[in-house]
Amino acid sequence: MSIKEHVKSMVKSVILLDKRRNRINMCNRAKLRNMEMSILSSNCAGGVMSHDLGLPFRSQFVNLALRPKDFVKYLRDLDYYNSLDVIFPEDVEPCWGGGQYPVGRVGDVTIHFVHYTTPEEAREKWNERKQRLNRRICS
């Protein structure tokens, strides 16, 4: 198989997968009864689900990652941690993806803002989305 044929085959596969994903997303959107929910996830999965369901990002846990123990700790005292400001100490190193991204702390919880480039951008999005969190459903 030539390179051109191989690329053509790959493109066709991607298009078919995209069409299948779109059909699945449409079915899931039709089943969705609560359009006001907040999806809390320790990694990017919550943002992907929100996007696929056509929901706005109603959680600060979008485009970031927390270690499982930090995520559980945060959820156990959501109101307390949400009342704190995120800080970006110099002594914390990124540990995922080998890239450079801001690492913040909210109290004793470490947050890896893996899809942001600056602490300012990460703080802005964190605070903006924290305000959108639907606490009515998180109780």
Residue ranges and their predicted role:
Residues M1-M35:
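Membrane-proximal basic amphipathic "stem/tether" segments
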